[in-house]
Amino acid sequence: MSDNDYERFEITDYDLDNEFNINRPRGRQSRHQQIYGIWADDSEEESGGEGGTKRRGRAARKPKDYTMPVNFVAGGIQQAGKKKKKALQADDEKGSQKEGAEADQGEESDDSAASGRPAFGQNDPGSSNSSSEEERPTLSRKQPSTTFQHRSHIASERNVGAWEQHTRGIGAKLLLQMGYEPGKGLGKDLQGISHPVQAHVRKGRGAIGAYGPETAASIGGKTNKSIKVDEDVREAKEFKDQLNKWRKGSAGGAEPMERQGKRYYYKSVEEVIAKGHTSGHLLSEKLSKKLGNVRVIDMTGPEKRVLSGYHALGQAKITPEETLYDTEATEKGSAPACVFAMPELTHNLQLLVSQCEQQIIAIDNQERECSSQQAALESEHRKLEEIVQLERNHIRTLEESLERVERLIDNPDLSLPQAERLFRELLVDYAAEFHEFGLADLAAGVIAPLLKRELVQWQPLENPTEPLPLIKKWRGMLQQGDAAEQQPRNVFDPYSSLIWAGVMPSFRSSAAAWQPKEHPPMASLLDAWAPLLPSWVLDSVLEQLVLPRLVAGVQEWDPLTDTVPIDSWVLPWHAILGSKLEEAVYPQIRSKLGIALRAWSPHDRSARAMLTPWQKAFPEEEMQEFLQRYIVPKLQATLGELIINPMHQDLELWQQVWEWHELIDPMYMAQLLDRHFFPRWMQVLVVWLNQSPDYAEISRWYTGWKSMLSEPLLREPSVKEHLRRALEIMHRASDTLLQPTVTPTPPPPVPPAPVIMMDLIHPPAQLEFKELVSQQCADLGIIFAPLPGRREMGKQIYRVGKLFCYIDRHVCMVSDGSFSNWKPVSLNHLLERSQTGIL
């Protein structure tokens, strides 16, 4: 195969149109190619006479000229389905094409004549090989009618049913007869469509999206009829224009474009401005000046373009005026040959047009900027006028408020009601200036002297509530507003300064004449003024006016000769002064009370009455230390004088000691009883048990002493231990009487021994005490069973007949059904009372 003759493998529109056409024309193989197949030689030297006829036709084609410039070929898939029109060509190209066509025609006719078979798809007007319906008459005139024409049976099927487009169906008529209403849907719920779905024919057989965005299917009858009417009008107008311009041509029946009338297209200023507003059309003015002298070569199009600068990149390629708006020439991708072409003149004209457009766009931009700047300046001017007017109003307001302030300051005969009226005008009518300039601070320098002069005749201790309405009125004026506005500007806020400079002088004069022992007047004064006084002012009154007077009164107080109790005029200040009294007053009181208690005796009950009010005032440690130092030694001596006699007990001394248990801590009271009471009490109990007494009487004596002790004291370990030992001694003493009933032979009599508590301890019995009680109950037929879930002091409770008891070591604690009152009893007494249920 020669260099100029090669086979292309790209897919063209012809391949897509004849993809499924079995009668498409194909190249005929020579005899040599049929024999040797792929091993056949296609070179011109070795080709025989069989293939010479075709090669002669191919050799007659015009060879390619490689000296000509490179022409770019448009890539992609060509738009198929459109009718192609003949383009105007030069005379030499017509001659060469005519010669090539005659050679090809002669070759095909020879092959057809040699084969003796009809040639399919050559001159058949219904064959798919023909390009369009308009070209068929021309081709038929050029080709001779010597060859046999064979029509394909497939081509005849194209016009089957074409007559239906001239008829009218009766489907709509039948629907109207069945009750169909035009414009509504079909079916019971009118959900069906009455028009078929309109399908849009694609331009070719390429892939989806190859011809632009796909058109969605629509329902017939719902399209906008006005659009179709406009299209029909436009097509009719175009057809009329073409008909008027039609003139019979020499070759194809159409007049060349050069002979037709020229059309001129004008751009308005609005179009140029709108084009300039599009992004990327023109570069900015600064960038255009910088890049204006740069030579740019554009090779992105079919041919090379030399541009004067980067600003020309966004402009379209220069096209002749004749084909500027020719849609058909644009679709073909080629323009008619230019007879008169002057690139330099065209470039200069285009440059002038571009410069003119740029000037128009620049003027428009400048006009827009000036308009925006003018609007901004007008807006700023209006704002400045408003600011000037506001400042004038502000100055006038300041002058008016200044005039009232000068009347407050410069008037020596100003009274408090007049000052109040001016002050209220400033607060109400000039509130912004009042808060901005802190006019409330005038209260300390202007209002306070007037208030002090107003309160000269006021007696605070006699009439504490007289000036309260006036002070409440000034507090409302000086403390109104938000919390942020009430923050003090100086050391004191305005209201505190007014109270300190106007009211405190009257408080100081009244406190100097106040007697501390007469506390109600001062207490009433502070109770009435406490809600109105600032916290720091109230603290100052208590610390600087009240506390010094209390300290002076305590120094003058004598507990032995003074008839007024000190707690009546000192303790009322405890809730207010608190720690201040503990530091300055209470130590002096304790010191004087201790001196007075040196000669005190417990039979004098006034000491306890004098100390009881101070129990909650003094700290707990200080109070207990004071009692241990001055009271407990006196109580120890009294307990030493107490005589414990079970037969005739005198409890006077015991009451003198026991009445202090509310003041003395239980721990210290337990230590006092452990050292000075319980040893002698245990000794008396042991002596009494050695004299064969009545154990019921001993039990009552034990219960009586225990009931006199308080619950906190009974929980002390030392007291509990003494009571436990007493119970154990009582139980062991009762066991000596029950010993003969347990064993058949009584033990030998014990010789008398000195009364010593250790001698009363017997060796342990062979049985446990619980087993002994159970055995005795079984012998007498008495029920002895534990109660599930019942415990007292951690001990199991048992049912013994009609009574309930629990065993604490070797002592029986008995109670009735209340389970509240428990008392110790002997085993014999338990067995006797268990049958009757009476303790």
From Swiss-Prot:
Biological processes per GO annotation? mRNA splicing, via spliceosome; spliceosomal complex disassembly
Gene designation: sip1
Q: Where is the G-patch domain?
A: 167-213
Source organism phylogeny: Eukaryota, Metazoa, Ecdysozoa, Arthropoda, Hexapoda
Enumerate the Pfam families for this protein: G-patch (PF01585), GCFC (PF07842), TIP_N (PF12457)
What biological function has been recorded for the protein in this entry?
A: May be involved in pre-mRNA splicing.
The record's listing under InterPro entries reads: G_patch_dom, GCFC_dom, STIP/TFIP11_N, TFP11, TFP11/STIP/Ntr1
* GO cellular component terms attached to this protein's record: catalytic step 2 spliceosome; cytoplasm; precatalytic spliceosome; spliceosomal complex; U2-type post-mRNA release spliceosomal complex
Does Nucleus count among this protein's keywords?
Answer: yes
Q: Which residues carry this modification: Phosphoserine?
A: 43, 47
Tell me its family.
Belongs to the TFP11/STIP family.
Compositionally biased spans, kind Basic and acidic residues: 88-101
* Matches recorded under PROSITE patterns: G_PATCH
Q: Name one GO molecular function term.
A: nucleic acid binding
Q: Which residues form a coiled coil?
A: 363-411
Chain positions with Phosphothreonine modification: 53
> Is Coiled coil given among the entry's keywords?
yes
* Biological source species: Drosophila melanogaster
Alphabetically sorted, this entry's keywords are: Coiled coil, mRNA processing, mRNA splicing, Nucleus, Phosphoprotein, Spliceosome
Q: Where is this region: Disordered?
A: 22-164
- What name goes with this protein? Septin-interacting protein 1
